[in-house]
């Protein structure tokens, strides 16, 4: 605050200095403006100049001059000069007016005398004019001194007024500063008081808490002391009881010995009477009783087992019959051929293309055989893999609808068809969840579940089989008073591994269980998946229900065909044998397994390696598989050079 006061005082002093300088300049300017302007002069006549050289006043440094007075006809009442701006002139206006008139008369007379030719009179006139000029000059100096004095008084008054205002302003600033300092001090005191009060409150709280803790500790110590006293008393009572028990034990030991002696004497007497020892008599009695008990127990167990078996079979038959009656499933057997209808027979030629270029490109890209026969307005698509067959069907349908069929267009539509089939798989999985009433499943599991829409097991659609199994398991779980969601979930996911058998080696049950465990399924569901083919012993009712639902869905009449499943497995193994080789890009089993087309990467497989690859694949197929006829292995190595014209 002291620094602020010093700065404010310095500013006030600077302002006062500036005001004083401005007033001084104003006074000097006023003094210059108030000096009378010199009257116009004319040169003296030769006669007057001669006289003036002798009688001129010694106070003037310049050459004496004679004022030109107005002519008689111009009026003698006007003064020669006026200075209305000076306050002294305003005060003596009348006197100066009279003097001017006299001077004018004298000047007029002087002029007339000069015109008359009297030199002496002219000299007198000049002398009077000079005296008058000296008087006017003295009067002007007195007026100037008076003006200077008044100006100095005004400056002094102004300085005093400014100093007083500065003192008042300084006092006000000091008072404001003191008030600000006082307010800050008061705020600091208030803050210190609040801090001190808070600190005192915290100290009081700590004291209260310490006191309460001390009271609690004292109470606990008192309880401990009471407990110790109670334990001591209890220990004394236990010691007394131990002594009493020891005495009783000694007494019982003595009595037991006496009873044993009496018992031995009695047994000896009985043995003498019966002719048998005690051990022999006991053995005979136990043998008789044991034989009777075993016979009765065997009869009871046989009766219970027969009754339980009859009731169990009856109840199981009723549960399974009820489940089958309540589930009405469609025929789920599927073939490996898809029929695509054409708008006209001329479209067959466009599908074949020039020299079969289009149909070869289609089969190479999709891995689906196109069978064109005499059937009007229809072509057949044949492939053991339902996913690949569906992708080929969508691709060919799009090409036929568009009308532009060439190898580049086939590749574009094939990529678009793959995306569409992937979306259909997701929708199929979601529809399966909605149909079975299951919610909150991991998206990857839903995707794998939807892929089973295009998988078959012995000719039966796997997704339809899973949905049917889920319904059967739910019905049987309801009959057994079990949780329905858990049984349905296990039955719906038990064949999940079939969606990955082409990618991962192993049993589909173990693969599905591992995938379900990885995506957070319940351990009971995982166990039911891995145990539905008895690869793991079932340990829960949910696993047994899953097995039952699987057998019911797959064992009903018309559900499966074993020959189709073995055929599909043989084709999958053929593709796997070729696909495991390094440098292989794609593998397609064509012509119902009689031809295998292997697409290789041209940068990794040259022409010589392609021949060796075809021979090795053919030899491995001969060693591992059993098949009718012959299988031709074709290795395709294609190099493309693409240029863009702009």
Curated annotation (Swiss-Prot):
Where is the KH domain positioned along the sequence? 336-402
How does the record say this protein sits in the membrane?
Single-pass membrane protein
Does this entry carry the keyword rRNA processing?
A: no
Q: Where is this region: Disordered?
A: 43-62, 69-118
Q: Which residues cross the membrane?
A: 4-24
InterPro entries membership: HD/PDEase_dom, HD_domain, HDIG_dom, KH_dom, KH_dom_type_1, KH_dom_type_1_sf, Ribonuclease_Y, RNase_Y_N
- Known EC number(s)? 3.1.-.-
HD domain location, by residue?
Answer: 462-555
Subcellular localization(s) per the UniProt record: Cell membrane
A single MF term (Gene Ontology): RNA binding
Disulfide bond residue pairs: none
Q: Name one GO cellular component term.
A: plasma membrane
Function according to Swiss-Prot or TrEMBL? Endoribonuclease that initiates mRNA decay.
Entries under NCBIfam families matching the protein: HDIG, RNase_Y
* PANTHER family registered for this protein in UniProt: RIBONUCLEASE Y (PTHR12826:SF15)
Protein's name in the database: Ribonuclease Y
Q: Which organism is it from?
A: Frankia casuarinae (strain DSM 45818 / CECT 9043 / HFP020203 / CcI3)
């Amino acid at each position: 605050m002291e620094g602020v006061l010093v700065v404010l005082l310095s500013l006030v002093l600077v302002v006062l200095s500036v005001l004083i300088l401005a007033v001084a300049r104003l006074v000097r300017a006023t003094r210059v403006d108030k000096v009378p302007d010199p009257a116009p002069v004319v040169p003296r006549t030769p006669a007057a100049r001669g006289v003036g050289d002798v009688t001129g006043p010694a106070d003037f440094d310049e050459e004496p001059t004679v004022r030109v007075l107005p002519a008689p006809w111009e009026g003698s009442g006007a003064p020669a000069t006026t200075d209305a701006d000076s306050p002294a002139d305003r005060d003596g206006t009348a006197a100066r007016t009279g003097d001017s008139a006299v001077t004018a008369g004298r000047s007029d007379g002087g002029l007339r005398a000069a015109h008359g030719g009297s030199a002496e009179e002219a000299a007198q006139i000049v002398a009077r004019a000079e005296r008058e000029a000296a008087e006017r000059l003295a009067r002007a100096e007195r007026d100037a001194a008076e003006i200077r004095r008044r100006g100095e008084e005004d400056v002094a008054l102004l300085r005093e007024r400014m100093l007083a205002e500065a003192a008042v302003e300084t006092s006000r600033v000091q008072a404001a500063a003191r008030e600000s300092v006082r307010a800050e001090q008061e705020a600091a005191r208030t803050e210190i008081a609040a801090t001190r009060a808070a600190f005192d409150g915290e100290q009081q709280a700590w004291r209260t808490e310490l006191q309460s803790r001390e009271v609690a500790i004292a109470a606990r110590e008192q309880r401990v002391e009471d407990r110790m006293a109670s334990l001591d008393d209890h220990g004394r009572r236990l010691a007394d009881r131990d002594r009493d028990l020891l005495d009783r034990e000694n007494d019982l030991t003595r009595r037991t010995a006496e009873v044993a002696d009496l018992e031995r004497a009695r047994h000896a007497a009985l043995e003498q009477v019966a002719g048998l020892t005690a051990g022999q008599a006991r053995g005979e009695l136990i043998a008789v009783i044991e034989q009777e008990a075993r016979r009765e127990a065997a009869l009871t167990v046989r009766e219970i087992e027969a009754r339980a078996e009859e009731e169990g079979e009856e109840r199981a038959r009723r549960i399974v019959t009820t489940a089958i009656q309540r589930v009405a499933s469609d025929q789920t057997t599927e073939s490996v051929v898809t029929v695509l209808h054409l708008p006209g027979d001329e479209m067959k030629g466009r599908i074949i293309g020039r020299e079969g270029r289009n149909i070869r490109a289609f089969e190479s890209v999709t891995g689906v055989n196109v069978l064109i026969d005499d059937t009007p307005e229809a072509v057949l698509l044949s492939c053991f893999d339902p996913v690949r067959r569906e992708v080929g069907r969508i691709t060919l349908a799009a090409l036929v609808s568009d009308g532009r069929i060439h190898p580049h267009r086939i590749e574009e539509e094939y990529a678009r068809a793959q995306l569409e089939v992937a979306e259909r798989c997701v929708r199929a999985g979601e529809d399966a969840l909605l149909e079975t009433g299951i919610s909150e499943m991991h998206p990857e599991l839903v995707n794998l579940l939807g892929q089973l829409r295009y998988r078959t097991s012995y000719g039966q659609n796997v997704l339809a089989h899973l949905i049917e199994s889920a319904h059967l398991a739910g019905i049987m779980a309801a009959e057994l008073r079990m949780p329905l969601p858990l049984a349905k979930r296990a039955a719906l996911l038990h064949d999940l591994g079939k969606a990955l058998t082409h990618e991962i080696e192993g049993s589909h049950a173990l693969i599905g269980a591992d995938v379900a465990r990885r995506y957070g399924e319940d351990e009971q569901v995982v166990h039911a998946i891995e145990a539905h083919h008895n690869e793991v012993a079932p340990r829960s009712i949910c696993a047994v229900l899953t097995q039952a639902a699987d057998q019911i869905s797959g064992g009903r009449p018309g559900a499966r065909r074993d020959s189709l499943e073995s055929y599909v497995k043989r084709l999958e193994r053929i593709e796997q044998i070729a696909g495991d080789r390094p440098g292989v890009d794609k593998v397609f089993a064509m012509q119902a397994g009689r031809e295998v087309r292997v697409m290789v990467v041209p940068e990794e497989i040259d022409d010589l390696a392609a021949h060796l690859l075809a021979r090795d694949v053919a030899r491995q197929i001969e060693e591992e598989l059993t098949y009718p006829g012959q299988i031709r292995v074709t290795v395709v190595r294609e190099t493309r050079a693409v240029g863009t014209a702009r």
